[in-house]
Amino acid sequence: MNRYRYNDLIIEVLDEPTYTLSSTNNFSYSKQYFGVDAKKYPTSAHGIKIYNADQIIDSCIVIASGGATGIHSTASLLDNDHLLLCCSDTVFCLILQDLELKWKVQADQGTCFQIFKQHDDYITHGEVQVTKLDKDGNIKWEFGGGSLLVSIDNDEEFKIESDGIIITDFSNTKYKIDFNGKLIYKV
């Protein structure tokens, strides 16, 4: 679970692996948002609850298809009055004031693992590609390696440095790209 403080509010982002559409056994989220094909093929569900003085004042759940995701420290981020969240193949951007959906975008063909703020934009590390999004959810560029962007030997597969991003793929090839998505080197 991720917790954020926003003004006098606490925002919780949690994994909901047992959430089932139309079930009465779920927490009753006030809003539901779906990625592409998520109503037919839901893979992951992540809940957002907003608390004021230990009372839930608003909530929503996001549901998406693609590879399964969980909640970890870089699966979501708070950017001023917006919450950005990776759920399966989709990034959702919610307005904190009322948990309305500002935008959603399919940022990877498989799974969106992580999201980071980079100046006025966002960088996502996905299973198949690295994607740069602008503040309105438009894709600025995508970069894919020769294989899945995961490491089998516990090497750090994704690292943002001051001058670019280092990525390691499944075949242990390392790439460095700049913040415009251009390849600097491949080893």
Region locations from a protein language model:
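WD40 beta-propeller blade core
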Residues: F92-C93, T131, Y175
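Short loop/turn segments that connect beta-strands within beta-propeller blades
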Residues: L96-D98, D134-N138, D178-K182
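Repeated scaffold domains used in trafficking and secretory/extracellular systems
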Residues: D8-I10, L14-S30, G35-D37, S65-N80, ...
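Short loop/turn segments that connect beta-strands within the blades of beta-propeller domains
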Residues: S44, D79-N80, C87-D89, Q118-H119, ...
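Acidic, small-residue rich beta-repeat scaffolds with periodic aromatic anchors
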Residues: E157-V187
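Aromatic (tryptophan-biased) beta-strands that constitute blades/sheets of beta-rich domains
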Residues: I56-G67, L101-T111, N138-V150, Y185-V187
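Extracellular-facing segments of soluble proteins and assemblies that are Gly/Ser/Thr-biased and enriched
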Residues: S76-Q106
